[in-house]
């Protein structure tokens, strides 16, 4: 606990006018776990684009009144955001809208470009004027430039994919089409389904399809472009080359909702397997197994089932406060832990506790949780982590941007155990990650430093905005 996801996207196209904004609203609600800084919806009503975007949760930004001001339409795209490039400002709220000579479009993007600065430099030299510090605007401008030289919006997206490096799962709405695209490595999830009235929907996770009553069809393949219009859907599978699929393994460990299925793998089942492996790797005599809500619960259940130690609900989560991993400020993170989790004393008092969590990044949150359990009377605490230690930055859309902030880069497992105040500490072995999804097709660069794409020197989350600020001085 202590990391955050980047974004969630949702799109819909229908053959006749309907309240598409309301459907996107429910879809974004189901994706709220993927981003809690801001959200937005853009509706296309016969070529007229109307949007509502702001900082805050879906429930805060979209009221009955604000939704009523969004028109009925045939297409809409929505987004929930945690900023992995660019700051937390209203300008960076998505979807990003762009006008061009051949029309207008709105783009929502999940992921992170590793060559965003290089692309932005070239665009600015050619006269582009940027209004945000988000790499999504860079994607939108590249598509716009390519659109002026191609016969269709899908051709423009195809050409753009040849220029982008890094992670992107995106949904684009133009005047007449909805486009969905997933990068050639498939770093971030993207799937689509269909509603009973024939509407097609696209979402970051299958749980969002279920939320709006859509039937899941399948995940987009790495490098695939789907084109939706009033006649239906056409797949343009390209840009795959010889690349091996590299879906982020942390989607399964932490980011995704447990009721989602990504690339035919149940997130819930993968977390159960992680807990079982931890029980095999690090057996211990204990009285109760407790998971840290929410993403540690399934792994805790797997550990309990495999070890035979009873499973207990020892931590209660306040559902009305955001994930600590999604709190950009360290002070906010500390304050939120104190009010977010509450120990169940009769489950913990006098017990030897196995505590299961999904990760340790800085150690800040973990220390607070251990203190909660100690104060509730835990006699022993044996911490088990359903991921390997974080040792490297992520450049593909996760907020792990500096080794200096990663506790495992500077301390051994035994030292970390002492710093956290636990009796023992064990991480999932990196060699076991493939067992979670029964495949070796995943990205684990934050654990092993093996980046599937070229990474520009000194690329950081804050470099994008810092460089832009330096230019203005």
Regions of interest found by a model, annotated:
Residues 84-85, 115, 187-188, 209-210, ...:
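Flexible loop/turn segments at secondary-structure boundaries
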Residues 308-353, 364, 391-397, 401:
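Short, glycine/charge-rich flexible loops or terminal/linker lids adjacent to PRPP-binding catalytic cores
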Residues 108, 173, 181-182, 193, ...:
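Generic beta-strand/beta-sheet core signal
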Residues 161, 176, 213-219, 371-473:
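PRPP-dependent phosphoribosyltransferase catalytic core
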Residues 128, 149-150, 283-287, 305-312, ...:
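Secondary-structure transition/capping motifs at alpha-helix termini
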Residues 1-222, 227-286, 292, 380, ...:
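Conserved short alpha-helical segments that host acidic/polar catalytic motifs at enzyme active sites
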Residues 132, 137-141, 311-322, 419-437:
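A conserved beta-strand->alpha-helix junction
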Residues 159, 207-208, 215-216, 220-224, ...:
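Phosphate/diphosphate-binding loops
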């Amino acid at each position: 606990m202590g990391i955050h996801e980047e974004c969630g996207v949702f799109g819909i196209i229908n053959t006749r006018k309907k309240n598409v904004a309301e459907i996107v609203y429910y879809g974004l609600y189901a994706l709220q776990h993927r981003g809690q800084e801001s959200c937005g919806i853009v509706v296309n009503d016969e070529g007229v684009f109307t949007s509502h975007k702001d900082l805050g949760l879906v429930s805060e930004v979209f009221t009955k009144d604000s939704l009523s001001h969004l028109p009925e339409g045939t297409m809409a795209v929505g987004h929930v955001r945690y900023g992995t490039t660019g700051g937390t400002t209203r300008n960076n709220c998505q979807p990003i809208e762009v006008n061009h000579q051949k029309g207008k479009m709105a783009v929502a993007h999940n992921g992170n470009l590793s060559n965003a600065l290089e692309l932005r430099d070239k665009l600015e030299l050619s006269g582009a004027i940027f209004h945000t510090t988000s790499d999504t605007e860079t994607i939108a401008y590249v598509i716009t430039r390519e659109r002026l030289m191609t016969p269709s919006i899908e051709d423009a997206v195809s050409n753009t994919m040849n220029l982008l490096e890094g992670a992107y799962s995106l949904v684009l709405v133009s005047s007449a089409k909805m486009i969905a695209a997933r990068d050639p490595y498939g770093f971030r999830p993207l799937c689509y389904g269909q509603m009973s009235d024939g509407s097609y929907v696209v979402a970051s996770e299958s749980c969002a399809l279920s939320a709006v009553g859509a039937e899941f069809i399948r995940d987009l393949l790495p490098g695939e472009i789907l084109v939706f219009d009033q006649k239906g859907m056409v797949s343009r599978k390209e840009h795959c080359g010889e690349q091996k699929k590299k879906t982020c393994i942390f989607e399964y460990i932490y980011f995704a909702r447990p009721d989602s299925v990504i690339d035919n793998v149940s997130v819930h089942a993968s977390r159960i397997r992680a807990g079982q492996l931890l029980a095999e790797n690090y057996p211990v005599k204990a009285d109760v197994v407790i998971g840290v809500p929410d993403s540690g619960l399934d792994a805790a259940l797997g550990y309990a089932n495999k070890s035979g130690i009873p499973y207990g609900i020892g931590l209660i989560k306040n559902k009305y406060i955001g994930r600590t991993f999604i709190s950009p400020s360290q002070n906010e993170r500390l304050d939120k832990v104190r009010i977010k989790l509450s120990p169940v004393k009769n489950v913990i008092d006098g017990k030897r506790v196995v505590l299961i969590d999904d990760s340790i990044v800085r150690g800040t949150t973990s220390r607070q949780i251990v203190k909660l359990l100690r104060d509730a009377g835990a006699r022993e605490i044996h911490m088990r982590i359903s991921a390997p230690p974080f040792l490297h930055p992520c450049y593909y859309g996760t907020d792990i941007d500096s080794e200096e902030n990663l506790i495992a880069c500077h301390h051994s497992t035994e030292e970390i155990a002492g710093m956290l105040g636990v009796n023992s500490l064990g991480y999932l072995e990196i060699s076991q990650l493939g067992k979670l999804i029964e495949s070796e097709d995943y990205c684990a660069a934050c654990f092993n430093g093996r980046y599937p794409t070229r990474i520009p020197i000194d690329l950081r989350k804050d470099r994008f905005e810092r460089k832009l600020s330096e230019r203005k001085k």
